[in-house]
């Protein structure tokens, strides 16, 4: 990467990752400069890339195409592996990856360790401690046709010089669509659970792993079968029945359901609170073996190693570690095809989402002979099934407004099951795409997915239109923003996307910005998620159009199986409540919010239709079974941040004594103070309650548990055997609300780079924000920086620099909302801390170091951080100004450049010495 080249992962959803339609690419000669510039990250253009012969290109054109496609693949990897929110279909992603691989094969200078083709999985988030894997955790190469699979099979036979007449033992197993996990056991005890991360370093998620019931805390079986040390590789996933149960619970709680089991498993495994993970019913199957050590004193002896995959699985079974039942031993290519055909027909019948079939050479010695590339073993391959296509009805086309104001049409589909999940909505990108596909509302349409990712609406089934023409209608893009009513228009001439220009106060844009600033890559306010953001910025979302669907006292509609709900008739005189004003009209007030501000915020929820029937259990007793079958179309309001009115709990005798003792101790301490405060109310320093209703003082009900932050809203008169008792009914901030405010307090002291990301500066993502924050040191310095100042920072390109400078220039305009936000945040203590300086010795001060190739002890990012933390400059390209080049495995053209310029080249061991001492 050149000094000022834009980092691919710094583009936001309005740039590289945005999915746009064909821009007239067919008019240009394939491989030409115009053709490359016209390419867009759409499925259609991905197909073009897949069919394109890269060997006809010049080296210069190939480099341009590589950079463009690599940026899209980088964005896809970030979205899939880090955000758990894929933006492209598997088919499109795989086509782009194959294009990169062909380019790198045809033009070796493009092949470098930083290429997405060498990346194992995705980089990890910063929520958990980074830990090095004892042995590298590889990914798998994919093939998408029987021909490609046969080529791999033949290459294995050829590389092993295997006799044609001799069967080669292999194993076949289903490829689980979950998250890779490395379990580390020492002397039979689970020591750590690590995510794959980049293959060298993963996240320590041990606490969450311990909550997964199928993972044993201690290895079982005879003592002589338990090694001193072992790494067990496998997959964490969610079974279909557990996934459906979780989504029902999500919807019943008013939370958005997960799109598919992989996303559900990922979100569950990365919870900061292990108690949440424990409720998610995750499962685990082992599928590989890492480092294995029996130890010198072990009965088996140090040389008694596992010989093949089958023996490893036998050991796992003895230890109580689950292995997928969907595996077979095979000895011929035809048996592999039989396995693929069987699960292709029965992929919907197994207990989890299926992502393909994995084929492995069974013998571990032969595996070592075959070796591996920089990212994947040569002794294994994953066959991916082709995309599934199904037909369904296009019920409607609505529009949604994104964070950058882009207005996107969304297809509302009759729910249909495809490739592992139920699909009810999918993006159509823009109005031109709708016209290009030729779809009409009411059409029968084709929907497809490759794996469990975002679906694509392919087009209409034209034969189904016959005789239904009067039921079809054309979609027309709106002229005005559906969220704020502003006039819509393209951002610049020639744009096919239309945008809402009301950046400051459009509720939809504001909601998306709040979601973004609270995300892990910014302030990391976990309990300020999508639903909370909507409640703060647009609480009237989903407000009924009329009283006909307003049912304030109906939270669910119970029906017998197969029955329809009774028609709803609103009571006479019922009126819709007055519309609420949002608590936040822009981001500036976020850090000034108090719990009291949120007390009356209510959001709209749809009453669920629940089927109820009785069944007889194994014990002969009857029990009621409830099943959520959909929405009723009836709406009611619920508190968004505070609890519903709840009778206070009566204290036990023991609790009353403990309270009295605590109050006496406080009173004694105050009385003995050197300077007692003369007060008539609460003692000095005591936090007053958020407010109580007149006449309802908490002190009037000493026998009840009324928390300090609670409000007594009424008093119920409860009749008991001893007479009438007054019971206070309270509301208080919910647990999630209290956690949200705690996290917001921590965010006031967030790292400077996180503040920059939270400001939603166009094109500025976390990596470049880190570079700028580290180089400039303070928000004040960044505010006053010029484009030249920023482009002088290695890794900051002119487009990003201009965007940052323009953003801060706008803050100085009178009345500008960005300036108001910045000043309000600074007044609340946000962004006033200077960037932390490293406490490590500055052994590399003034030195420029380039790292190329794969290092065993460092990921790409951790190597750069190690250099920067010691005062050095981690450059992306080799020049005369470079002091050292660290050479890892599979180093590319940078090594040749260093040799040409006579720059010292270091091994990983020498790199460690350089970090420690500054010399070699």
From Swiss-Prot:
The EC number(s) given in the record are 6.5.1.2
A GO term from the CC aspect: cytosol
**Which source organism does the UniProt entry give?**
Bifidobacterium longum (strain DJO10A)
List the HAMAP family. Answer: DNA_ligase_A
Enumerate the GO terms in the molecular function aspect: DNA ligase (NAD+) activity; metal ion binding
Q: State its role.
A: DNA ligase that catalyzes the formation of phosphodiester linkages between 5'-phosphoryl and 3'-hydroxyl groups in double-stranded DNA using NAD as a coenzyme and as the energy source for the reaction. It is essential for DNA replication and repair of damaged DNA.
Annotated protein name in UniProt: DNA ligase
Task: Provide the BRCT domain boundaries.
Answer: 839-920
Q: Which UniProt keywords apply?
A: DNA damage, DNA repair, DNA replication, Ligase, Magnesium, Manganese, Metal-binding, NAD, Zinc
Catalysis performed (reactions)? NAD(+) + (deoxyribonucleotide)n-3'-hydroxyl + 5'-phospho-(deoxyribonucleotide)m = (deoxyribonucleotide)n+m + AMP + beta-nicotinamide D-nucleotide
